[in-house]
């Protein structure tokens, strides 16, 4: 069995887990998430914890048990604490403004870029060069952050662009005469 799947997921107080066939519904203080479990994975609820295991002994079933455990653990963390991702805008005149369910980005193009924020995600701009994305779904938060970063990724010569907070960009040396 997968080493990840061997560890049970503890269910904290205030989190409700319901099984509806192969669908696992998790409800907490910040919202609710659901996941469809693969037929070859077995999920059991025992005294405040969820345990995972393969129904058959195939390598794929064992791998899927670990994947399912990681996904459900992220769902439990999401409905209790939530997830956040910070982006930094580096470059002269690069700015961001949160306007309702959209972010207005000025990234050196001839026009401002308006990025629509999907449902279940909130974005705020504490400063003009910082964007904070929050939500309960880890995958969605990361996807939105990656889409914003892809509008103007950091370039390798000056490092200008949108980068994750704490990201190290390798800067190349300019061509010498």
Curated annotation (Swiss-Prot):
The keyword RNA-binding applies. GO terms for biological process: cytoplasmic translation. One of its GO terms (molecular function) is structural constituent of ribosome. The keyword Ribosomal protein applies. One of its GO terms (cellular component) is cytosolic large ribosomal subunit. Keywords: Ribonucleoprotein, Ribosomal protein, RNA-binding, rRNA-binding. Belongs to the universal ribosomal protein uL6 family. This protein binds to the 23S rRNA, and is important in its secondary structure. It is located near the subunit interface in the base of the L7/L12 stalk, and near the tRNA binding site of the peptidyltransferase center. PANTHER family: 60S/50S RIBOSOMAL PROTEIN L6/L9, LARGE RIBOSOMAL SUBUNIT PROTEIN UL6M. Part of the 50S ribosomal subunit. This is Large ribosomal subunit protein uL6. It comes from Hahella chejuensis (strain KCTC 2396).
């Amino acid at each position: 069995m997968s080493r990840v799947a061997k560890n049970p997921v503890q269910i904290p107080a205030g989190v409700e887990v319901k099984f509806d066939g192969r669908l696992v519904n998790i409800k907490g203080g910040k919202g609710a998430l659901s996941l469809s479990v693969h037929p070859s994975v077995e999920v059991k609820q025992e005294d405040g914890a969820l345990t995972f295991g393969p129904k058959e002994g195939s390598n794929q079933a064992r791998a899927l048990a670990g994947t399912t455990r990681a996904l459900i653990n992220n769902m439990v963390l999401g409905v209790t604490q939530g997830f956040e991702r910070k982006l930094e805008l580096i470059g002269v005149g690069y700015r961001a403004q949160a306007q309702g369910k959209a972010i207005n980005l000025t990234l050196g193009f001839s026009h401002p870029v308006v990025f629509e924020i999907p449902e279940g995600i909130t974005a705020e701009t504490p400063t003009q060069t910082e964007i904070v994305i929050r939500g309960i779904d880890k995958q969605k938060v990361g996807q939105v952050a990656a889409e914003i970063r892809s509008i103007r990724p950091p370039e390798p010569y000056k490092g200008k662009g949108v980068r994750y907070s704490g990201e190290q960009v390798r800067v190349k040396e300019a061509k010498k005469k």
